[in-house]
Structures are given as structure tokens and as C-alpha cells.
């Protein structure tokens, strides 16, 4: 392994990423943070509490090659935006009908379920003319970041930044064509996988994540519910 930073856990990653963020600029621009995955909620919630900024979830699901669940060939977002890895699709001679069929199935079976569970069934809030920064706990292929960026562009955001503790160097370069600014603790030339850069991971079960979101003063979709409970 290269001489890279290894994070103790998501809380450690949150602290180190927070240190390099342009805090005043993000606050002055009233930036909305977009959490890209349920696994990243522990880190993102901590950063948002420290920044004093609100966050939203943007749900997406990976589409795997037939008979190879470890090989991601596409990613679909909650607006049914799709990003394809055409090179892999062609190399494995996978039909595009299969890919789009799987994308729709993932949307129906996984994404809609998550929207109901973690956002009470509501669509993502109005993002027009918002400055947003997408965050996740690590970036290996960039497909999820790319589908999130494309989704946000279609939603009419004003600017998109991306913050992640670790990212593959080549992916950071390719994402720079669609993302305004990338903030990262470490760019890694020979990227292994995200979990390799964490000593351990804090519990991120659905129940744990839901509890964090319900208790958080910064998770935008549930703020109205919290206020209603207090009244």
C-alpha cells in the first residue's frame, strides 16, 4: 500500500475532512450538503453539525454485472438518472436492455424503499440555484459521484463541490470535468477499495442510520417533523 492516511473510523475521517474544508466560504454561500450514501451518514452528520449546515440524502443504487456482484457496471439515482461504465458493459457483452431493466428494478425495489424509510416518502427538496457539496466516505470508481452530479445538474443547482476523505487519483481527474471543486484528505494512485483506508467502521445498520437522522438537528427532511413534535 502507498504511504496513505488510514482513518480510525468514520468519526476520524469526518474530523480530518472538516479540517480541510473552506468553512467560512461554505457557510457564507449557504451551501447545502448532499450525503451520497447511507454508509456516509455517520461522517456527514458529524461534519454538518460542526459546520452548522443542513444536509439532504440523494439515493442511488449500483447495478452489478450478471454473476459478478462485485463488478459495478452502472449506477442509477432516485431521479432515474443513469451513469454507465460502457467499457465494462462491452467487455462482458452485457445487453443494455439488461442494464436499463436492472436500473428500473433497483429504483422500484431499493431506492423507493429508502425514500420512504429515510425521507418519509418525500421527494428531494427544491435545489434550484443552490450551492451544494456532495459528500461520501470514499471514492473508488466515481460512478456514484458522477450520477449524483448529473442528477443535481438536472435539478438546477448553481454549483457543485465534492468532499471525500479518500479518492482514486484518476477518478478525481475525470470528475473535475463535471464538479467545480474537489476537497479530499488523500488522493491515491493505486486505489484498493474504500474500506481498506479505515481501521474499523462504526455500526451503520439501517436502524442506526435512521436513529442518527431522526436525532440530527441538521438532517433537513426531518427538521419539520422534529419541530412538530416539540410544539
Name each model-derived stretch.
Residues 1-231:
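PRPP-associated nucleotide enzymes
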